[in-house]
Amino acid sequence: MSSIQGTSGSSPERLPNSREDEGMNPEGVTPSGQTISFSAVGKSTSAEDIQQLALPIIQSDAMASSPSVGGAVGEVEVAEIIADVMEKNDANVQKLDEDMEALLQAISSSEEQLESPGVRNKSALKGTNRSNSHREEIARNQRLRSLSVRHGLAYNRHSLRRLARGIRHHAGLVTASFATLHKTLRAVPQEDLKSILGKDSDTVLARLHKLGLEVNEKGEWRLRANGEVGSINQSICNLARSAERLHDDGPLSINDQASEEEVTACCSAGRRACQFLQEHLMGALRAIYYQILRFFHWISRRVEVEPEDTDYYMRPGIFINPYASYLSSSPSVEDPRSLRDRLRDGGALSGEDTLFSMPQDESLDSESVSDDDRGFQ
């Protein structure tokens, strides 16, 4: 099956190395020295297989789960917990950039092998005494049998492209929400804001400064493009654009001399790489929704100014994750609860200290949201 290998240390459990198809095994190497390779097998890949492959790289406290706050805690503890989670964003985004480089390299290698005239020929076409018509018939049958596999790869590539467009849309939502928070804070005098935040004021203001929202010498709030929000938004957009560039409108043009086994092996490797790439993009999306937007909404509630209804997913008093169905199907191994249960807990806070208030109806369910609302065009 697909394998993730490291140049030092042992390989992850239940991820055996494949030597048999080494020539057909595209791989990429991260700057840290880790080798990511995709080896094809003769069976379909399940969602559990992809999760098993993705977890060793994308799993982290900040990405795999929302901040867990138990019991009734004070304002200082809430701010410290949020600040601690936010501190991990830079490292997570950097790791995504590094891993993505290796993944894109692996996908490109897989596609080059599919189209290369130098692909090894393991088929029965090596008989030189057979007639040309017989060889052509065998080749035609092989192409027909491999067509479904090729279309499967094309479908995965198309789905990944749509996902990338949607993620770019929601990365922009973070920037728009940051601008809304900027407008909200401008309406609150500095002294009043510090009084409202109480002991949390220094912590929250320092966090806002690092995110890219600061007070200038005139006492006015100013947005900085080089803050964490701008950096994360740009990184996510770069990853999405890289994913979009991998696609064309139809199946790959495969070398006619390749056998059915070779075509299946390469297509399976490409599909695994695409699915693995989706896991990385979803990990980045978790970081956005579980950390930054919750922090913005918490501040808005503290200053008692409801955020504007600028997006379907950020209504006043409601936090809606458009990917709730997807994420709830892939829960963190550290938190077996569903996404709905985790969000309904609201961080186990009470009253005015709740990071966001959850509706009692079914508005959290994302199944009723259309593709256009999700940002998929």
UniProtKB/Swiss-Prot annotation:
Region: Disordered, residue numbers: 1-43, 109-141, 328-377
Coiled coil residues, start to end: none
Biased composition (Polar residues): 1-11, 31-43
Biased composition (Basic and acidic residues): 334-345
Family membership: Belongs to the chlamydial CPn_0499/CT_392/TC_0671 family.
Protein name: Uncharacterized protein CT_392
Phylogenetic classification of the source organism: Bacteria, Pseudomonadati, Chlamydiota, Chlamydiia, Chlamydiales
